[in-house]
Structure formats: C-alpha cells, structure tokens
C-alpha cells in the first residue's frame, strides 16, 4: 500500500506542477499558439471523459455493488458521480468570473497597469489553487486504484494546467519585470494539487472502507467530466476552430482506449 501511496502522490505532484511549464512558455514566446492549445485542450477533455465513463465509473460501481447489493451499490455510484459534479460546480461558482481559471487569457491580451496586473496574477493564482484541490484528490485516488488509469489522467491535467500557468505568470511578470516572482507564484498555485491529495487522504483515511472508496472513485469521475465539459472544451473552442477541438477530443478518446486495451 505504501508503494501505491508514493506512486499516486508523485503522479499528482507532476500534474499540479505543470503550471510551471506554462510559466516558462510565457517567458520564451510572445505569441500564443492557439492551434496547439485548442487541439491539446480538446485532447485532454477526450482522455478525461473517456476514462471517467469507460473505466472509473464502472470500476466504482463494481466496488460498491460488491460491498453492498447490486441496487444500492448502483444508486450510490450514480449519486456519488453527480455529487462530484456538484462539488466542483460549487467551487467553480464561488470563484469570481474575472479570476476564474476557466477564463484563460492569451499572452497578447495582457496589457494593463502594473498594480492591476499584479492583483490579477495573484488572484488568479489563488483561484487556480482552490480549483486544483479537488483535481489533486481525483488524480491521487485514481493513482491508488491503478497507475495505468492515472498516467493518462496526469497527462491530461498537466496539459490543461499549462495555460493556467500562463494566466498566473504573464500579468505578474509584466507588473514586476521579475521572472522569478512570476514563476514562483505559478509554481505555488500548482502545489495545491499534491496538497489537496495529502489533506484529502488524511481526512478520509480514518473512515476509509470499500463503500467510501467506491463512492469517492465515482465522485472523481464526476469531477473530471465536469472539468472537461465546463473548462477544457470551451477553452479549446475559444482558442481555435470548432473542428480542431473535436479532433482533439476524438484523438484523446482513441489514445485512452488503446492504452486501456494494452493493459488488459
């Protein structure tokens, strides 16, 4: 179990700290590659939707129906799934729209007063940190269940964290002229994912059993579906043409399907 815990934590940390990659990209380029971002974000959505509905949700249902009976376990699976959606939706609603990490800006759009830019960067970092808490727990729980499921999820979350890193670092860099400060705040916002995993695990450990574990696993599926539909797909559409986003989604589903088949 300790080996699984270590692996799950490392995977979660890698996903969260990819915000630092976004920060570095912001320093070396003056233009946002919208086509690449559109396809990449669509790809992330495809991976997360496919693995949630084809692998995580059925696995949660199997765990719960074995721990309970078929009817009760199936009902709890569905309730936990939509409970996960409700949780991330509430968190999303509590974040002001102007600071919401879903409202991603391109590098070219940041041109305001230094004080306002600094505040924007700091508030975005805080918002992303709050938003990344449940993502961290979702990645961690997936890693505990099966690393082969978690690795594609980590890649998908890492891809969608890159533009969030840009959203934090660009305004802070333009306000202060300090790459170190911009990178630090971007990096710290990503730490919320492994922190969310640690806090969530220690809170749940005293009550952990197959029913709780299965319910959390189903809620993880709900969280990832909501993130995909509410965040990744709209961002993919905003950055590029409609079909680029859809091609990205289909590619993500295909890669995820093949990777799961390889581990059968």
From Swiss-Prot:
**UniProt-annotated binding residues for Zn(2+):** 135, 160, 164
Q: Which GO terms describe its cellular component?
A: plasma membrane
Q: Coiled coil: which residue ranges?
A: none
Q: Where in the cell is it found?
A: Cell membrane
Q: What is its main location?
A: membrane
| Superkingdom | Bacteria
* Catalytic activity field: Zn(2+)(in) = Zn(2+)(out)
The record describes the protein's role as:
Mediates zinc uptake. May also transport other divalent cations.
What name has this protein been given in UniProt? Zinc transporter ZupT
């Amino acid at each position: 179990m300790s080996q699984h815990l270590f692996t799950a934590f490392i995977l979660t940390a890698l996903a969260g700290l990819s915000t630092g990659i976004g920060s570095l990209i912001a320093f070396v380029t003056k233009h946002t590659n919208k086509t690449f971002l559109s396809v990449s974000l669509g790809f992330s959505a495809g991976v997360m939707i496919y693995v949630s509905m084809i692998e995580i949700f059925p696995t949660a249902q199997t765990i719960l129906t074995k721990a309970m009976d078929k009817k009760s376990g199936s009902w709890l699976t569905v309730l936990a799934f939509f409970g996960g959606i409700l949780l991330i939706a509430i968190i999303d609603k509590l974040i002001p729209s102007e600071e919401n990490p879903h409202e991603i800006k391109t590098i070219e759009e940041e041109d305001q007063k230094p004080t306002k830019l600094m505040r924007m960067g700091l508030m975005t970092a805080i918002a992303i940190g709050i938003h990344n808490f449940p993502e961290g727990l979702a990645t961690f729980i997936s890693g505990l269940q099966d690393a082969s499921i978690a690795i594609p999820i980590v890649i998908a979350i890492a891809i969608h964290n890159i533009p969030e890193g840009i959203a934090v670092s660009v305004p802070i860099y333009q306000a202060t002229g300090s790459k170190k400060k911009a990178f630090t705040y971007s990096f710290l916002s990503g730490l919320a994912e492994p922190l969310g995993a640690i806090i969530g695990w220690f809170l749940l450990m005293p009550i952990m059993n197959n029913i709780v574990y299965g319910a959390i696993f189903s809620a993880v599926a709900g969280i990832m579906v909501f993130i995909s539909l509410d965040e990744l797909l709209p961002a993919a559409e905003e950055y590029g043409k409609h079909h680029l986003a859809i091609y990205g989604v289909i590619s993500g589903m295909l890669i995820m399907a093949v990777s799961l088949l390889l581990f059968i």
